[in-house]
């Protein structure tokens, strides 16, 4: 079963609180994520993973009745959290996906304290939902 694990990060001053961390704190966080991803890859569980650009670089695109789509800034600046990155994992049970998400959530933050970031876990559909 494939699951998408979506890491939600808190906003800080500006886009992302991590931008206010000390260099050694940011380095420890990146090293944790690198080691975490390598372990998932070595176990054969990692399908893909990516970090995402800052919310200020995001755009919302909608179809219009005209030829060109409407492109606006987004997501909303008043949001307290934003999608910072994701993993797609292939595991045998939901519990395995939850365990992986729990480890990701504990990535170190300021002072080395675990961030306890919210990680949303959703199964990737293998086909369309059943229709009665």
Question: Predicted segments — roles?
Answer:
Residues 1-132:
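Conserved, structured core segments of small domains
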């Amino acid at each position: 079963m494939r699951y998408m694990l979506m890491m939600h990060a808190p906003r800080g001053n500006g886009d992302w609180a991590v931008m206010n961390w000390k260099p050694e704190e940011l380095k420890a966080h990146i090293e944790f994520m690198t080691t975490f991803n390598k372990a998932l890859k070595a176990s054969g569980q990692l399908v893909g993973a990516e970090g995402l650009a800052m919310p200020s670089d995001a755009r919302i695109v909608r179809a219009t009745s005209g030829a060109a789509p409407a492109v606006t800034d987004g997501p909303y600046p008043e949001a307290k959290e934003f999608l910072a990155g994701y993993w797609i994992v292939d595991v045998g049970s939901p519990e395995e996906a939850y365990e992986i998400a729990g480890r990701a959530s504990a990535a170190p933050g300021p002072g080395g304290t675990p961030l306890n970031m919210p990680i949303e876990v959703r199964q990737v559909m293998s086909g369309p939902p059943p229709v009665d």
